[in-house]
Amino acid sequence: MAPMIPPRLQRFPATASADEIFAAFQEDGCVVIEGFISPEQVARFSQEVDPAMEKIPVEVTNNGNSNDRTKRFSKCVIASPTFRNEIIESDLMHELCDRVFSKPGEGMGYHFNDNMVIEVQPGAPAQRLHRDQELYPWWNSMGPAGPECVINFFCAVTPFTEENGATRLVPGSHLWPEFTQINERDCPQFGKIETVPAIMQPGDCYLMSGKVIHGAGHNATTTDRRRALALAIIRRELRPMQAFSLSVPMKLAREMSERSQTMFGFRSSVQHCDVDMVHFWGNDGKDIAHHLGLEAPSVHV
């Protein structure tokens, strides 16, 4: 049987230390960070992606598909200057990513998997419960002791309420002894899982382990379009969902910080192995940035 689930979400202001937030993340697998994005940034970002979101049709499938009455948009870095110049430059985000993925002397241990606006429309059904690490199917076989494969900074762009489909989280599920497919009837917890809604104001986010069971809630309203920004980050050894370095114009890439260029695949991540320096996503043993004509990095990231 699974251990008792704490019926709460720990919450911290964005001014809290990364160590405090990370300790709660380790304990529960998910934690709310209040004010992760400023109100001004949220307003500008939402306005900048509005034109693209309006062009996306609303699908009504009624078949359990995760796109049922849910819009998704993954070109935030192109559509939003606020996103690429401010939101992804959060030092707190990178401090937490370092604690999850990076090791001393091994450089930047992570990059973006996806950046997605997710807008749950009125009447959208609840999403099936799942773990994000199931994107990489073998990861569940390692159980709770396995390394983190993916984390998500899931940011509220509009208010998250229980009525409009706030994400349902299962704190503590990252420590369950068995990581079986939770929607299968042979799962010991099938039909018995207690979820907690992530109630948030615009600018708040929850940081979630890829091991945590969760799913979007049912939007029972007739008017609310529950909009979120998902910043999904994976360990550098894994292939991302989005081919950013092939789809983002070089003009925009040149304007990014070295850190963001690495996050999107315009720079290699460097690992020191014994006496060698290994480039992940490199070119002929060198940093891919040289091939792309970018300036040499001031430090190895």
UniProtKB/Swiss-Prot annotation:
GO terms for molecular function: dioxygenase activity; metal ion binding. Its EC number is 1.14.11.-. The record marks 150, 232 as: Important for reaction specificity. Pathway: Secondary metabolite biosynthesis; terpenoid biosynthesis. The keyword Zinc does not apply. Coiled coil: none annotated. Signal peptide: none annotated. Keywords: Dioxygenase, Iron, Metal-binding, Oxidoreductase. Fe cation binds at residues 130, 132, 214. It catalyses: preaustinoid A1 + 2-oxoglutarate + O2 = berkeleyone B + succinate + CO2 + H2O; berkeleyone B + 2-oxoglutarate + O2 = berkeleydione + succinate + CO2 + H2O; preaustinoid A + 2 2-oxoglutarate + 2 O2 = berkeleytrione + 2 succinate + 2 CO2 + H2O. It is an enzyme of class 1 (oxidoreductase). Residues at positions 150 and 232 are important for type of reaction catalyzed, using identical substrate. Both ausE and prhA accept preaustinoid A1 as a substrate to form divergent products through dynamic skeletal rearrangement. Belongs to the PhyH family. Multifunctional dioxygenase; part of the gene cluster that mediates the biosynthesis of paraherquonin, a meroterpenoid with a unique, highly congested hexacyclic molecular architecture. The first step of the pathway is the synthesis of 3,5-dimethylorsellinic acid (DMOA) by the polyketide synthase prhL. This is Multifunctional dioxygenase prhA.
